[in-house]
Amino acid sequence: METIAKHRYARTSAQKARLVADLIRGKKVAQALEILTFTNKKAAALVKKVLESAIANAEHNDGADIDDLKVAKIFVDEGPSMKRVMPRAKGRADRILKRTSHITVVVSDR
Protein backbone atom coordinates (compact mmCIF):
# COMPACT_ATOMS: atom_id res chain seq x y z
CA MET A 1 0.00 0.00 0.00
CA GLU A 2 1.43 3.37 -0.99
CA THR A 3 0.89 6.38 1.26
CA ILE A 4 1.69 9.98 0.34
CA ALA A 5 2.64 13.09 2.31
CA LYS A 6 3.39 16.51 0.84
CA HIS A 7 4.85 19.78 2.04
CA ARG A 8 3.94 22.46 -0.43
CA TYR A 9 5.62 25.89 -0.56
CA ALA A 10 8.57 24.80 1.60
CA ARG A 11 10.95 27.75 1.99
CA THR A 12 14.01 26.15 0.46
CA SER A 13 15.16 25.84 -3.12
CA ALA A 14 14.36 22.61 -4.93
CA GLN A 15 18.03 22.19 -5.81
CA LYS A 16 19.07 22.15 -2.13
CA ALA A 17 16.19 19.88 -1.07
CA ARG A 18 16.98 17.36 -3.82
CA LEU A 19 20.45 16.81 -2.32
CA VAL A 20 18.76 15.56 0.85
CA ALA A 21 16.03 13.62 -0.98
CA ASP A 22 18.65 11.62 -2.90
CA LEU A 23 20.13 10.39 0.40
CA ILE A 24 17.01 8.48 1.50
CA ARG A 25 15.40 7.30 -1.73
CA GLY A 26 14.70 3.54 -1.54
CA LYS A 27 15.77 3.16 2.10
CA LYS A 28 13.76 1.67 4.98
CA VAL A 29 12.01 4.44 6.95
CA ALA A 30 13.94 3.76 10.18
CA GLN A 31 17.25 4.12 8.35
CA ALA A 32 15.99 7.18 6.45
CA LEU A 33 14.97 8.93 9.69
CA GLU A 34 18.39 8.18 11.17
CA ILE A 35 20.16 9.62 8.12
CA LEU A 36 18.01 12.77 8.19
CA THR A 37 18.57 13.27 11.93
CA PHE A 38 22.33 13.51 11.41
CA THR A 39 22.31 15.42 8.12
CA ASN A 40 23.41 19.00 8.75
CA LYS A 41 21.16 20.75 6.22
CA LYS A 42 18.06 22.94 6.64
CA ALA A 43 16.25 20.84 4.03
CA ALA A 44 16.90 17.68 6.07
CA ALA A 45 14.59 18.93 8.83
CA LEU A 46 11.86 19.72 6.27
CA VAL A 47 12.16 16.33 4.55
CA LYS A 48 12.21 14.54 7.92
CA LYS A 49 8.95 16.20 8.92
CA VAL A 50 7.28 15.12 5.66
CA LEU A 51 8.60 11.56 6.07
CA GLU A 52 7.25 11.38 9.63
CA SER A 53 3.89 12.58 8.32
CA ALA A 54 3.90 9.89 5.61
CA ILE A 55 4.68 7.22 8.23
CA ALA A 56 1.85 8.46 10.46
CA ASN A 57 -0.53 8.51 7.47
CA ALA A 58 0.39 4.92 6.59
CA GLU A 59 -0.10 3.74 10.17
CA HIS A 60 -3.35 5.60 10.82
CA ASN A 61 -5.11 5.51 7.44
CA ASP A 62 -3.88 2.19 6.04
CA GLY A 63 -2.99 0.28 9.22
CA ALA A 64 0.51 -0.42 7.89
CA ASP A 65 3.30 -1.89 10.02
CA ILE A 66 6.05 0.71 10.44
CA ASP A 67 8.83 -1.90 10.34
CA ASP A 68 7.87 -2.93 6.79
CA LEU A 69 7.73 0.59 5.32
CA LYS A 70 10.32 1.97 2.92
CA VAL A 71 10.66 5.21 0.98
CA ALA A 72 9.20 4.14 -2.38
CA LYS A 73 9.41 7.58 -4.01
CA ILE A 74 10.60 10.99 -2.98
CA PHE A 75 10.76 13.99 -5.25
CA VAL A 76 11.09 17.75 -4.95
CA ASP A 77 9.42 20.08 -7.43
CA GLU A 78 9.91 23.82 -7.77
CA GLY A 79 7.26 26.04 -6.22
CA PRO A 80 6.59 29.68 -7.00
CA SER A 81 9.38 32.18 -6.35
CA MET A 82 8.80 35.30 -4.30
CA LYS A 83 10.40 38.31 -5.93
CA ARG A 84 12.03 40.84 -3.61
CA VAL A 85 14.11 43.97 -4.22
CA MET A 86 17.50 44.71 -2.67
CA PRO A 87 18.64 48.35 -2.96
CA ARG A 88 22.16 48.84 -4.30
CA ALA A 89 24.48 51.79 -4.73
CA LYS A 90 23.70 54.81 -6.94
CA GLY A 91 19.95 54.25 -7.06
CA ARG A 92 20.10 50.82 -8.58
CA ALA A 93 18.31 47.71 -7.34
CA ASP A 94 18.80 43.96 -7.63
CA ARG A 95 16.04 41.39 -7.71
CA ILE A 96 16.19 38.65 -5.07
CA LEU A 97 14.36 35.37 -5.74
CA LYS A 98 13.13 33.63 -2.60
CA ARG A 99 12.58 30.16 -3.96
CA THR A 100 10.06 27.62 -2.68
CA SER A 101 9.61 23.92 -3.35
CA HIS A 102 7.05 21.14 -3.06
CA ILE A 103 8.38 18.06 -1.23
CA THR A 104 6.52 14.78 -1.85
CA VAL A 105 7.27 11.53 -0.01
CA VAL A 106 5.65 8.18 -0.89
CA VAL A 107 6.12 5.27 1.53
CA SER A 108 5.20 1.69 0.69
CA ASP A 109 5.18 -1.66 2.50
CA ARG A 110 6.24 -3.55 -0.64
UniProtKB/Swiss-Prot annotation:
Gene Ontology molecular function:
rRNA binding; structural constituent of ribosome
GO terms in the biological process aspect are: response to antibiotic; translation
Q: Which UniProt keywords apply?
A: Antibiotic resistance, Ribonucleoprotein, Ribosomal protein, RNA-binding, rRNA-binding
Top-level taxon: Bacteria
> What GO cellular component term, any one, is given?
cytosolic large ribosomal subunit
InterPro entries in the record, alphabetically?
Ribosomal_uL22 (IPR001063), Ribosomal_uL22_bac/chlpt-type (IPR005727), Ribosomal_uL22_bac/org-type (IPR047867), Ribosomal_uL22_CS (IPR018260), Ribosomal_uL22_sf (IPR036394)
Q: Which SUPFAM superfamilies match?
A: Ribosomal protein L22
CDD domains hit by this protein? Ribosomal_L22 (cd00336)
Instruction: List, alphabetically, the PANTHER family matched.
Output: CHLOROPLAST 50S RIBOSOMAL PROTEIN L22-RELATED, LARGE RIBOSOMAL SUBUNIT PROTEIN UL22M
Q: How does it assemble?
A: Part of the 50S ribosomal subunit.
Annotated function: This protein binds specifically to 23S rRNA; its binding is stimulated by other ribosomal proteins, e.g. L4, L17, and L20. It is important during the early stages of 50S assembly. It makes multiple contacts with different domains of the 23S rRNA in the assembled 50S subunit and ribosome. The globular domain of the protein is located near the polypeptide exit tunnel on the outside of the subunit, while an extended beta-hairpin is found that lines the wall of the exit tunnel in the center of the 70S ribosome.
* Family under the similarity heading: Belongs to the universal ribosomal protein uL22 family.
Name assigned to this protein: Large ribosomal subunit protein uL22
Q: Which organism's genome codes for this protein?
A: Haemophilus influenzae (strain ATCC 51907 / DSM 11121 / KW20 / Rd)
